[in-house]
Amino acid sequence: MMSFLKGRLAGNKGYTIDQTILIVAIIAILITLIIITVGWQLITRSTGTKLAAQLRQIEDANGQFYSQQHMWPYQAQSGTATGSSNMAALANQLASGSWTNAVDTSQLSNLIPGFTSSAAGVTQPNGGAVTEVVNTVDSVGLGSGKFIVVQFADVSLGDAEEADKAIDGEDDNKTGRLVYQANACTGATAMPTISAAPSNGTVNVCYVANAVQ
């Protein structure tokens, strides 16, 4: 009888040791899951914001180049300008004979520090190629006119989404200054109609930067 009463009293006092251990373990697991989820969101948001800053850095570099040379990088080359050579011009990686006579070579410098550059072109920190061309942009809802459009290749979808929010205020991959899709988002003379974003993987991100006309 005494043992029965002791058991009842112990049961009325609260959880058993085994139950307490189980509850503590469950709480610990839930806290870990929350930390992992929130941490990943913060990391993605941070890298997306960094991507937006890198795109704006190139836009600013174009403006600085124009201020110094009174022409855009694509106009400063003696040969046919390409998306890669335009970026090489910003990084001062073109061969000396590749500039037009109108360029003041004493003013040339690397205007995009932080990017890996060579005569072949420029890559972003994650290794994807960076190019820029002049395109019309009416297909992305920005009206008429010609702009320098910067493209980053092989960007993670999450980074593209967060960069879109940072630049356009919302994640809409088809319109605005920042768009992205699985295929290239620049064309020979005009930006293409942007397709729906993939559900995962990497994308090409395009940023409508400086107005040239």
Model-derived features: positions:
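Membrane-proximal N-terminal amphipathic helix
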Residues: 43-73
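Extracellular/periplasmic head regions of type IV pilus-like filament subunits
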Residues: 71-161, 169-172
